[in-house]
Amino acid sequence: MSSSYRMELDKWLASLDVKADMVLDIGGSQLPVRGRTKTWVVEDYKIADLPEPHIESPKPDIEVDLNSHSSGLEHDYDIIFCLEVFDYVYDPYNAFEIIKLGLKKGGIAWVTFPMMYPLHQPIEDDALRYMPSGITKLAKAVGLKIVQMIPRRTETDAIYNAFRTERMRCAKHEDHNISGWIVEFTK
């Protein structure tokens, strides 16, 4: 069974209408966006991923490593999806630059960011978690504009209750049942 974190993303994707000439799915080898949205009217769809993304995953159309300074993105995409990738990114500034480089002016990038997620496989690649202010600062630094930040909420209050039990000082007047973000950027 999928995690509530994944189910929240799938629910959001199932409500999304996608209509574009060119769409890039960064990290999409394992679980492509195509086939998961409400509607899909796309002329040219490409997957960009690591050369050997996952065991038994298809090879990507374009080889891209968001932690590397050579991107391989040479097109202006109308829409870029980068879902469930940023927990493996240890150079987020570079990753933001690559997304900006691939996005056409006025295009949209949908990117997910984990805020709370346990260490997971492959553990040697699991790197970072993101807070809203960090996402905002990275976007501003590379010249991307945030259109919206959609919170991904936990199903229960268990995580917040764990913070309280451990006497961690949570910021007042904030929702501590948010486990991550779905962010819409534009160039």
Spans of model-derived segments:
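Conserved N-terminal segment of class I S-adenosyl-L-methionine
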Residues: 1-75, 79, 179
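A short beta-strand submotif of the Rossmann-like class I SAM-dependent methyltransferase core
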Residues: 79-85
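Activation segment
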Residues: 54, 70, 89-90, 139
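Short conserved AdoMet
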Residues: 18, 90, 104
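Short, solvent-exposed loop/turn segments at secondary-structure junctions
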Residues: 29-33, 52-53, 68, 86-87, ...
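S-adenosyl-L-methionine-dependent methyltransferase catalytic module, highlighting the catalytic core
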Residues: 90-98, 108-187
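Redox-cofactor binding/interface segments in oxidoreductases and associated redox assembly factors
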Residues: 25, 82, 111
